[in-house]
Amino acid sequence: TSQPDCSVGCDTSYCPDTSSCNCGTFADYCKCCQYCNACAGKTCNMIAGQSCEDGYLCRPPEGYSYIDVVTGRISSLCLRI
């Protein structure tokens, strides 16, 4: 997959509502929309590059690998850096 084409402009009408984000937000690749961070200890989408709240990183739980996440064996979690 290729990176999105950010030169086409930004239509914020397609952006999600982030008013109920409990753990902050992060900007998409083109810096157009904001998305909710996943909270500490909660599942996150490591494959899609979902961010976690400050001080945490979306990764496989201890004892598991990225392959375990990709194959659906386990979900990634927001774990302390």
From Swiss-Prot:
GO terms classed as biological process: hemolymph coagulation
Keywords: Hemolymph clotting
InterPro entries per the UniProt record, alphabetical: Growth_fac_rcpt_cys_sf
Tissue/organ expression: Hemolymph; Hemocyte.
Subunit field text: Multimeric.
Protein name in the entry: 8.6 kDa transglutaminase substrate
Provenance organism: Tachypleus tridentatus
